[in-house]
Amino acid sequence: RGNTSSMEVQIDHVVALSNAWQTGAFKLSIKERTAFANDPMNLLAVKGRLNSQKGDGDAATWLPPLKSYRCDYVARQIAVKIKYKLWFTAPEKEAMVRILKSCPEKALPTS
């Protein structure tokens, strides 16, 4: 990262920190919150523009524009939320179910 690239490439928290807090991370210890924030399963290098669009959105409010990647992205969100015992809002769950119907064989990542 440098002066010209830092806005082009950013690190996305697949489960946004704010979303995590709202769905149970406030119950985690400081050590667990630090692990969550730095967990490679929850981190992706993405276009800065897309990270800005997503903000603290979940699957109900934002999905990757590349439709062929949505199953992977949603599966990753689910895996992260399960790992840290975070919950899903009803709209988020509905969006995830809708996406995963197109890829019923998709397994959740483990790391």
Regions from the PLM with identified roles:
Residues 1-111:
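Domain-level detector of nuclease and nuclease-like folds
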